[in-house]
Amino acid sequence: MKQPQTESNVLKNGLVGAFYLIGLQIISRLFTFIINTLVIVGVDDSIFGVSAIQYQLLSSIILFLSREAIRRACTRVNITDKLNNDNNLKSVINLSWLVLPIGIGLSIIFENFFLYTSTKETLEILNYHYGLRLFTISSILELLSEPMYILAQNLLLFKIRTTVEGFALFFKTFSTYYFIVILNMGLIGFGYAQILYSLTLVIGYFGYFLINIINNNKNKDNKEFSNCFKSIDQLFPKFSTRIDRNLIKLSLLYTWQSIYKLLLQEGEKFVLFFSETNQGQAIFAIVSNLGSLIVRFLFLPIEETCFLMFPKLFPTINNNNNNNNNNNNNNNNNNKNQENNNNNDDFKNGANVLIVIMKFLILVSLVFTCFGPGFSHLLLNLLYNNKFRDTNAGVLLGFYCIYVGFLAINGVSESFVHSVAKEDQLKTVNWVLIIIGFIYLLFTLIFCKLFQNIGIILANCLNIKLSNMIPNKMVLLSFIISFIITNLSNKYIYNAVSFKSTCIHLLIGIICFIQTCTFIYLKEWVSIKEFKKILSNKNK
């Protein structure tokens, strides 16, 4: 059986996993971004708006509410522990398969919700209902792969996720271009591409575990999860085995956090669905996808890796351990003192990792906050051949770049709190998050009425608090100066129809970027060395 993970191994595997996920995001997203740019130029705005906002919102609701809480609870269980492996593994398997019936029930409810609440303009779009049904089916298929995904994540098999999701994204991108641009199938084409994506996930994850079980039975050495699984039956639920109560409680606690996270990540789509035209939805979807590239490239993989690392880097105290310790207090004082010393060292090391990661993300986000607004118009005009020159898409993208700065801090800090908090702390956090989530929706609706699409991004910024881990003052000053100069250049120098003014605007941006990077190197060298030191652990 796989050996329990030490702190150094967890950090090593976590960092390697982060690099695999970041690599997957960069390669796949750049490829899909190029193809999607061609799709956007060739498809009607209304069709793209329905697909990118309404269909994706339906899929997100089904997937989030079905699997997010169970996924987070299961990743906190150590199925490689020698003493408790069998019980833990059975509980994780049984609980992970509950996502399927939950997802089917939610699919029926929310598909009908979208049909009854859609506008007359939307319902008149060709094959709207058929496309909606295809996205519902694809969501259920994706949930079918969830038990194997949870096992792969729990065992820190990041290579498997990188490979499977990479192939799935490539198939989805190629099929989208084929169905939409070549065959001109409209909304049905988006649905078919989504189903191919889900099928690839199912085949990939199940195929990996089935092949390894067959190899284990043939007495072949398997270093990935040595003899953790000996038969195919272990991958499926057993009604004779009960799910651990603590795991169920943890899942229920994370359910409230899933609702909050859904409101945070998809709240703007709810507001757009009820208040914007299909064309307005399309513009926001394009800007959102473009503006959140850094989030998908870098922030999201690091956030997911941190959620897997922190429970193992920071010692957690559960109710069972407390009860066992109370019964043996008089006999194990020396052991407890030693354990407390080890826990203190673990907390120091874990805290150092957290601080360095946060500082790095803040610096990256400041680059986008500083240079994004000044070059958003130019980027959109270059990518989409001036298709959105007469809209507010450029201003919207500029505000989205500022929003990215808030996202950088929120993701990792949220992963830390949710992965190491005790049960009573999670209960308190849940109620606070739910209240904040509904307040956020209220702000989103109000700002959307006042500022249209830009108001949605302003509401998002209010929902996320800044940390006190800010960079050096000179670095901040260089960012502020660059921000002012590039935006003045964008307003008074840049002209979309003038090649000369475009080149001058780009040159100003390059000069400002170089001077900002110079200050980062000079004033944040200590943080850079600490970050390098953490990265070097992956080779040890």
UniProtKB/Swiss-Prot annotation:
Pfam families linked: Rft-1
Glycosylated residues (UniProt): 78, 94, 487
Pathway(s) annotated for this protein in UniProt: Protein modification; protein glycosylation
Organism: Dictyostelium discoideum (Social amoeba)
Membrane topology: Multi-pass membrane protein
Entry-linked InterPro entries: RFT1 (IPR007594)
GO cellular component: endoplasmic reticulum membrane
Primary location: endoplasmic reticulum
Keyword Thylakoid: no
Region: Disordered, residue numbers: 321-343
Protein's UniProt keywords contain Transmembrane helix: yes
Subcellular localization: Endoplasmic reticulum membrane
Family: Belongs to the RFT1 family.
One BP annotation, GO: glycolipid translocation
UniProt keyword list: Endoplasmic reticulum, Glycoprotein, Membrane, Transmembrane, Transmembrane helix
Role of this protein: Intramembrane glycolipid transporter that operates in the biosynthetic pathway of dolichol-linked oligosaccharides, the glycan precursors employed in protein asparagine (N)-glycosylation. The sequential addition of sugars to dolichol pyrophosphate produces dolichol-linked oligosaccharides containing fourteen sugars, including two GlcNAcs, nine mannoses and three glucoses. Once assembled, the oligosaccharide is transferred from the lipid to nascent proteins by oligosaccharyltransferases.
Transmembrane intervals: 15-35, 46-66, 95-115, 140-160, 166-188, 192-214, 282-302, 353-373, 393-413, 431-451, 466-486, 502-522
Top-level lineage group: Eukaryota
Higher taxonomy: Eukaryota, Amoebozoa, Evosea, Eumycetozoa, Dictyostelia
Stated name of the protein: Man(5)GlcNAc(2)-PP-dolichol translocation protein RFT1
